[in-house]
């Protein structure tokens, strides 16, 4: 794999020689994020042709929708995707070697009077992606967008009455799962602003939208009903039980034929503890089959390795400043996938490791990979992450890992890491490039 210590003639370097950029903003976005993206593709075993294709798509179809390049003194749209408002995040399914990235589409009218709450940019972005990838279907995209994001009238009402006081205004984002030369597209919806406009809770908006959908697509009804019953029991007993109430925070779905698409409901869990995670995993004891129990054993193993601090936590109301070193811990989260013709929702739990030491997290993951036969990942993961930030004191960093997700299906663990993706590789590439994350930067290594 090509690393920052030995750049050679890697895909990123060659494309950087070829590409022209229509603006300095896009040029900065490319050189800030593509080194890590290219290394991740290489590390995950994508062939050279697929690496060029995915990086080319990223440059042509994604970077134009990332907005102004963030600096400490520049006004910009803040995205809920990351704690400092960056609109892009790389993630890696370490056990399946699948690269993924998520972004909140932003354009020139985002945050202006023409689109105060960034409702419109995603429409243009998703249409462009649909032109280059076969199989994208927008039926459920359109349905959930109508149900969970502001319409023109609601946006005008919120704006004219100044009803939105919060920093966090994200309504939707897209994700691409890169599978060989192709990609699968997903959409995520955050109905917080819709909640302000309608007076309905975010939780009710999400569950009501899925209920309506399940009346048309009854093959997801059994799993949805099990999830509804579990959440109802948890929330009914929240005041007397050690576990707190569960609240839906966001929803996602695959942008494919609705007969094959999955719906995922994400629940915010404010109590971080192993017992709560076990409850989320088993749906309060309803899932007790052999595969679930095997997954539970691995979940407990990860909990022991990662050493996530326990506590009852609130999600922060605002963002961290760009470059600010976190001194916080986030609450937990789980999502439940509703598969067609499957009576049980499938859980995926999230270890909230943001703010913890990245070197220690990398070491813990390496042990897990070694124990379960993921030898290449055990050998390469920490090296890849260090080489993505070669000018930083890796032992001191505590913001590279945001979450670690875990699920278990077909007798196999699925573990993904969600990573800080900004000022990667040999940044700054140019003398005039801004540096925001400098708290743990060492003397710059020689590039000779």
Swiss-Prot record:
Positions bound to L-tryptophan: 80-81, 89, 190, 249
Chain positions recorded as substrate binding sites: 100, 186, 188, 262, 264, 266, 348, 350, 414, 418
Top-rank lineage group of the source organism: Eukaryota
Catalytic reactions of this protein: L-tryptophan + dimethylallyl diphosphate = 4-(3-methylbut-2-enyl)-L-tryptophan + diphosphate
Protein's pathway: Alkaloid biosynthesis; ergot alkaloid biosynthesis
An MF annotation (GO) of this entry: tryptophan dimethylallyltransferase activity
UniProt EC number: 2.5.1.34
GO BP field: ergot alkaloid biosynthetic process
Keyword Manganese: no
Applications: D-lysergic acid amides have been used as medicinal agents for a long time. The pharmacological effects of the various ergot alkaloids and their derivatives are due to the structural similarity of the tetracyclic ring system to neurotransmitters such as noradrenaline, dopamine or serotonin. In addition to migraine or blood pressure regulation, there is a wide spectrum of potential new applications of this interesting group of compounds.
Record keywords: Alkaloid metabolism, Transferase
InterPro entries: Aro_prenylTrfase (IPR033964), Aro_prenylTrfase_DMATS (IPR017795), DMATS-type_fun (IPR012148), Trp_dimethylallylTrfase (IPR017796)
UniProt subunit comment: Homodimer.
Family assignment from sequence similarity: Belongs to the tryptophan dimethylallyltransferase family.
Function: Tryptophan dimethylallyltransferase; part of the gene cluster that mediates the biosynthesis of fungal ergot alkaloid. DmaW catalyzes the first step of ergot alkaloid biosynthesis by condensing dimethylallyl diphosphate (DMAP) and tryptophan to form 4-dimethylallyl-L-tryptophan. The second step is catalyzed by the methyltransferase easF that methylates 4-dimethylallyl-L-tryptophan in the presence of S-adenosyl-L-methionine, resulting in the formation of 4-dimethylallyl-L-abrine.
Matches recorded under PANTHER family: INDOLE PRENYLTRANSFERASE TDIB-RELATED (PTHR40627), PRENYLTRANSFERASE ASQH2-RELATED (PTHR40627:SF3)
Protein name per its UniProtKB record: Tryptophan dimethylallyltransferase 1
Organism: Claviceps purpurea
């Amino acid at each position: 794999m090509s690393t920052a210590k030995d750049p050679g003639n890697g895909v990123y370097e060659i494309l950087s020689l070829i590409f022209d950029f229509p603006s300095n903003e896009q040029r900065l976005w490319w050189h800030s994020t593509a080194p890590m993206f290219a290394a991740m593709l290489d590390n995950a075993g994508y062939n050279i042709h697929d690496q060029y294709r995915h990086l080319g798509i990223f440059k042509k179809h994604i970077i134009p929708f990332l907005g102004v390049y963030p600096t400490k003194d520049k006004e910009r749209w803040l995205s809920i995707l990351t704690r400092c408002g960056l609109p892009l995040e790389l993630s890696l399914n370490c056990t399946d070697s699948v690269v993924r990235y998520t972004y909140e589409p932003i354009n020139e009218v985002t945050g202006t009077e023409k689109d105060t709450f960034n409702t419109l940019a995603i429409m243009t972005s998703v249409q462009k992606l649909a032109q280059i990838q076969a199989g994208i279907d927008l039926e459920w995209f359109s349905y959930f967008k109508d149900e969970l994001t502001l319409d023109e009238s609601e946006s005008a009402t919120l704006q004219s009455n100044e009803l939105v006081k919060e920093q966090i205004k994200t309504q939707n984002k897209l994700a691409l799962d890169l599978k060989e030369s192709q990609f699968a597209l997903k959409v995520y919806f955050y109905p917080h602003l819709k909640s302000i406009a309608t007076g309905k809770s975010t939780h009710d908006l999400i569950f009501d939208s899925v209920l309506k959908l399940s009346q048309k697509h009854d093959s997801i009804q059994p799993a949805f009903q099990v999830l509804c019953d579990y959440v109802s029991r948890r929330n009914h007993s929240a005041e007397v039980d050690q576990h707190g109430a569960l609240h839906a925070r966001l929803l996602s779905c695959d942008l494919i034929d609705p007969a094959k698409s999955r719906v995922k409901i994400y629940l915010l869990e404010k109590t971080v503890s192993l017992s709560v995670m076990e409850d989320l995993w088993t749906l309060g004891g309803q899932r007790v089959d052999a595969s679930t129990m095997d997954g539970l054993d691995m979940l407990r193993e990860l909990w022991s390795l990662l050493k996530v601090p326990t506590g009852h936590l609130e999600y922060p109301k605002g963002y961290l400043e760009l470059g600010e070193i976190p001194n916080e811990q986030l609450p937990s989260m789980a999502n439940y996938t509703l598969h067609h013709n499957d009576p049980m929702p499938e859980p995926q739990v999230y270890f909230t490791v943001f703010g913890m030491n990245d070197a220690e997290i990398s070491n813990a993951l390496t042990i897990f990979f070694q124990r379960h036969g993921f030898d290449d990942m055990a050998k390469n993961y920490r090296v890849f992450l260090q080489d993505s930030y070669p000018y930083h004191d890796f032992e001191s960093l505590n913001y590279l890992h945001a979450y670690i997700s875990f699920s278990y299906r077909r007798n196999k663990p699925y573990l993904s890491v969600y990573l800080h993706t900004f000022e990667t590789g040999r940044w700054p590439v140019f003398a005039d490039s801004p540096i925001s994350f400098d708290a743990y930067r060492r003397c710059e290594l020689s590039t000779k």
